UniProtKB/Swiss-Prot annotation:
Function: Necessary for normal cell division and for the maintenance of normal septation.
Record keywords, A-Z: Cell cycle, Cell division, GTP-binding, Magnesium, Metal-binding, Nucleotide-binding, Septation
Protein name, per record: Probable GTP-binding protein EngB
Cofactor (UniProt): Mg(2+)
EngB-type G domain location: 30-204
InterPro entries: G_ENGB_dom (IPR030393), GTP-bd (IPR006073), GTP-bd_ribosome_bio_YsxC (IPR019987), P-loop_NTPase (IPR027417)
Pfam families according to UniProt: MMR_HSR1
Residues noted as binding Mg(2+) in the record, renumbered to the chain: S45, T66
Species in which this protein is naturally found: Pseudomonas paraeruginosa (strain DSM 24068 / PA7) (Pseudomonas aeruginosa (strain PA7))
GO molecular function: GTP binding; metal ion binding
């Protein structure tokens, strides 16, 4: 499916646009953009790089290194945004509070934001940060696609059970605000499905093409 998905070729042309410390430093609020969020050490940077076939996000063994909103241009009207991966114990509390305020402001006010990819470590899903993101998405009527990352760390049956359990809890707590799937960057599991969601949000799919959710 990747060969037919226009997002692949578009992402290969991606280039760094700007870093923003707060909402008023973001690029003009026009066109379409998709953001990538996740608690520190949830595999956000690896997922972003795998989906785009590019080294857009800096990966690090030290969680919590992303402290700015990093914008990447795909073309004149489409962007990807790497959101701060705060939540790690070594990140100072004032910094966490600062990013909580600015992240909420970004998610609630950004008209061009078409959706958010939320990375959850399949072994530690629905952290306080994850729940906060789901709350904000529900309040802003913003779609979220959850990647249950590091699925290769569990046996297939255990991974599917974890997915079903989290899906039930998300549906009970937040309704249909989120879709979910298994994902593994090293094994490239779930890449095609996630790329279809990304292409749909960025207006790259024909009207008769729809991403297929994982059962």
């Amino acid at each position: 499916m990747s060969e037919k998905n226009p997002i692949v070729g578009l992402c290969q042309k991606a280039s760094f646009l700007i870093s923003a410390a707060q909402v008023d430093q973001c690029p003009p609020d026009e066109g379409l953009e998709v953001a990538f969020a996740g608690r520190s050490n949830a595999g956000k940077s690896s997922a972003l790089n795998t989906l785009t076939h590019a080294n857009l996000a800096r990966t690090s063994k030290t969680p919590g290194r992303t402290q700015l909103l990093n914008f990447f241009s795909l073309d004149e009207s489409r962007r990807l945004v790497d959101l701060p991966g705060y939540g790690y114990a070594k990140v100072p509390i004032p910094l966490k509070q600062h990013w909580q305020r600015h992240l909420e402001a970004y998610l609630s006010s950004r008209e061009s934001l078409a959706g958010v990819f939320l990375m959850m470590d399949i072994r530690h899903p629905l952290t306080d940060f994850d729940r906060l993101m789901l709350d904000w998405a529900q309040a802003s009527q913003l779609p979220i696609h959850v990647l249950m990352t590091k699925a290769d760390k569990l046996a297939f049956g255990a991974a599917k059970n974890a997915l079903l359990k989290v899906r039930r809890e998300v549906q009970q707590g937040w309704g249909d605000v989120a879709s979910l799937q298994l994902f593994s960057a090293p094994k490239r599991q779930g890449v095609d499905e996630a790329q279809m969601v990304l292409a749909q949000w960025l207006g790259l799919l024909d009207e008769d093409e729809e991403p297929v959710g994982e059962a």
